[in-house]
Amino acid sequence: MRIIIESITPEMRRTYDYDNLERVYAEYQNRVVDDEPVMSSFASKMAGKKVLLLAPGVTLRTESDRVQKYIAHENPIVIGVNHVPDDYRCNCFFFANAQRYQYAVDTNANEMRRADVIVTSNVRSVKVGANVVNFNLLAKRGWRFFDNGTIMALRFLRKVGVMDVAFAGFDGFPAEDSRLCYANRVFQNDLSMELKRAINEDVLSMLRDFQALDKGMTKLSFVTSSL
């Protein structure tokens, strides 16, 4: 939905009330749930542990040796963000996107049942057993693309006491339009280069904002080539 809104030309935005539609989109995401038991449970499981976030970028395939070596050496909690990655065994999955969540349920039901699943409250059709956390607890306004799943997962980890986070597959969109962006080709899209650059800029800005507010308390590292 957000990508559709952002791809509309200024002329079309003046003709139709798309700015109001964007406000409605943000309000729709805001479904409040009692997530205190979930936060407390994951604080007990994860606080003080190393965590590896597997974003869906293509480097999960092209740099898989580096990722597997990191997992073998560091023994982190492995979390798939907005996807169930091939060739990696995850301890947990984090979803902030309804379409990606449903795709995972439909195509990887066994993995979704085996591991812990964390879902933000904007995802409405949640299966029994998923751990729902408040979208607005993890989303921060001030950017066009404020609902990036990896950034939201990072904020979740900070709130449950994780102080050592590594990223893999956190690639961003490539400068060359023809290059694959995702480890799973199903997720490929035809966004304009202008829109891809804007998304990259927002994600980088949100990451820097996290670091500024965190004041260096959380160790961040990148296992694969990144933004």
Residue locations for each model-derived region?
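Metal-ion/cofactor- or nucleotide/acyl-coenzyme-handling active-site neighborhoods
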Residues: 1-227
